[in-house]
C-alpha cells in the first residue's frame, strides 16, 4: 500500500521501519520542523526525519509548522496519492481537510487503553497514576482528540520499577507490531464512505465511561514534594523520567531512579530494597537522609514509608548512583 507516515520522536521510528520492512511503499513522511538542541543549539532533525532520510532515500519529508494553516502543504500531501495515513506521535492535530484525503483513512497508534489517557502524554500519566496496565490502540482518526473508534488494541502490564523511557520503548515496538497487523485488514476492507469502511472493519467505538485526559505537564509537575508518600513520589520519578527534580542544598537535583520502601510491595522491589522495606524506620523531616546504604543509595524520609534514592544527577555533575551518589549528597 501507499502509506503517508506522520511521526516525530524516536517512539515513532519502529513503526516507520516496520511498515517499510513489511513491503509497504512509504510515499511521504510528515514530521515536526528541525529544532535547536544540545549545548551548541544546533538545528537538529527529528528522529523520524533523520531515520527517513537514511532509510527511504529521496522520499519527500515535509516539516509543516502548523499543518492546519498551510493549504499549500495540504495540497502537496494530496498530490502524493497515499492510500492511507499512519500517525504515531506526530505532535499536531490533523485538520478535517487532511483526514479526508486518503481513501482508506487516517489511523493513529495511541499509547494507552482508550478512552483512558487521551492526549499527548499517556505514558507519563499512566505511570504517575500507578496504572497496572496500559497498551496500544490503533484508532481511526476523527477531528476530536483521540476519540475515534478502535480497530486493534493490545494491553501489557506496567512494572513498578519501570520508567517512562523503558515503557515507551516497549509501547513503541507494540505499536509497530499492531500496525503491521492492521494494514492488511484495512486494505482488505477497501475504500468507500467512511461509515461503510469502518463497519466492514468492525471497529469498536470508545466508551463514554472511563474517559481521562493526559493534560500537558507544567513545570510545577516536575517538582518533587518530599511531604508526599513514597509511592506517589516514586511514581512521579518514573513517569517524569528524566525530569523530576528537587532542590538539594541550593542546587537542582534530578531524581532518576527510586524505590518506595513499602512492605506490601516487597515482591516488586530489588532484593536490597525489599529487605529495607521490612525494617522499622523512625519519623523524620521529609526529604532528610535516614541512612546511607553502602553500594546502593540513600534512604530518604517522606510523609509515610521512606524511599530509596538509587540514582540522581546533581546540578553541574554527571548522573551518579551507589557510593558515588552517597558521597555527593551526604
Curated annotation (Swiss-Prot):
Its EC number is 2.1.2.9. (6S)-5,6,7,8-tetrahydrofolate binds at residues 112-115. Keywords: Protein biosynthesis, Transferase. GO terms for molecular function: methionyl-tRNA formyltransferase activity. Pfam families: Formyl_trans_C (PF02911), Formyl_trans_N (PF00551). It catalyses: L-methionyl-tRNA(fMet) + (6R)-10-formyltetrahydrofolate = N-formyl-L-methionyl-tRNA(fMet) + (6S)-5,6,7,8-tetrahydrofolate + H(+). It comes from the Bacteria. Disulfide bonds: none annotated. InterPro entries: Fmt, Formyl_trans_C, Formyl_transf_N, Formyl_transf_N_sf, Formyl_transferase-like_C_sf, Met-tRNA-FMT_C, Met-tRNA-FMT_N. GO terms for cellular component: cytosol. Belongs to the Fmt family. NCBIfam families: fmt. Attaches a formyl group to the free amino group of methionyl-tRNA(fMet). The formyl group appears to play a dual role in the initiator identity of N-formylmethionyl-tRNA by promoting its recognition by IF2 and preventing the misappropriation of this tRNA by the elongation apparatus. This is Methionyl-tRNA formyltransferase. It comes from Synechococcus sp. (strain RCC307).
Amino acid at each position: 500500500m501507499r502509506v503517508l507516515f506522520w511521526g516525530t520522536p524516536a517512539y515513532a521510528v519502529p513503526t516507520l521501519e516496520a511498515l517499510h520492512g513489511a513491503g509497504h511503499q512509504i510515499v511521504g513522511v510528515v514530521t515536526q520542523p528541525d529544532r535547536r538542541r544540545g549545548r551548541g543549539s544546533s538545528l537538529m532533525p527529528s528522529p523520524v526525519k533523520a531515520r527517513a532520510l537514511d532509510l527511504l532515500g529521496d522520499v519527500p519529508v515535509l516539516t509543516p509548522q502548523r499543518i492546519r494553516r498551510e493549504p499549500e502543504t495540504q495540497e502537496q500531501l494530496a498530490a502524493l496519492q497515499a492510500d492511507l495515513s499512519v500517525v504515531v506521535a506526530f505532535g499536531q492535530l490533523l485538520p478535517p481537510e487532511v483526514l479526508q484525503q486518503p481513501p482508506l483513512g487516517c489511523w493513529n497508534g495511541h499509547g494507552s487503553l482508550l478512552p483512558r489517557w487521551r492526549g499527548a502524554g499517556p505514558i507519563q500519566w499512566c505511570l504517575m497514576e500507578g496504572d497496572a496496565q496500559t497498551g496500544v490502540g490503533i484508532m481511526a482518526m476523527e477531528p476530536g482528540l483521540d476519540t475515534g473508534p478502535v480497530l486493534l488494541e493490545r494491553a501489557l502490564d506496567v512494572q513498578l520499577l519501570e520508567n517512562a523511557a523503558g515503557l515507551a520503548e516497549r509501547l513503541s515496538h507494540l505499536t509497530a507490531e499492531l500496525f503491521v497487523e492492521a494494514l492488511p485488514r484495512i486494505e482488505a476492507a477497501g475504500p468507500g464512505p467512511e461509515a461503510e469502511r469502518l463497519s466492514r472493519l468492525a471497529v469498536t467505538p470508545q466508551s463514554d465511561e472511563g474517559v481521562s485526559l493526559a493534560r500537558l505537564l507544567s513545570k510545577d509537575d516536575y517538582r518533587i514534594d518530599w511531604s508526599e508518600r513514597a509511592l506517589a513520589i516514586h511514581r512521579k520519578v518514573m513517569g517524569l523520567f528524566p525530569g523530576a527534580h528537587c532542590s538539594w542544598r541550593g542546587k537542582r537535583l534530578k531524581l532518576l531512579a527510586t524505590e518506595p520502601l513499602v512492605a506490601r510491595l516487597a515482591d516488586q522491589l530489588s532484593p536490597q530494597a525489599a529487605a529495607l522495606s521490612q525494617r522499622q524506620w523512625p519519623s523524620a523531616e521529609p526529604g532528610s537522609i535516614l541512612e546511607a546504604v553502602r553500594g546502593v543509595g540513600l534512604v530518604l524520609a517522606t510523609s509515610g514509608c521512606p524511599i530509596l534514592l538509587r540514582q540522581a544527577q546533581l546540578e553541574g555533575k554527571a548522573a551518579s548512583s551507589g557510593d558515588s551518589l552517597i558521597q555527593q549528597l551526604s
